[in-house]
């Protein structure tokens, strides 16, 4: 049982690292798919909060 939880934790950690190192469009698509269930106002808030982080490398 502990081995199964250990492998699940490792796979989740690798998936998290993969999502960190993915290009910004994939991350934006993932955030929009997560916030699509909520209202449009919260989606706009998420985009306003996330977009400056993707603009900073271009400076």
Swiss-Prot record:
* Signal peptide positions (record): 1-29
Q: Which UniProt keywords apply?
A: Secreted, Signal
Tissue expression from the record? Expressed by the venom gland.
Subcellular localization(s) per the UniProt record:
Secreted
Provide one Gene Ontology cellular component: extracellular region
User: In which family does this protein belong, per the annotation?
Assistant: Belongs to the non-disulfide-bridged peptide (NDBP) superfamily.
Protein's UniProt name: Venom protein 27.7
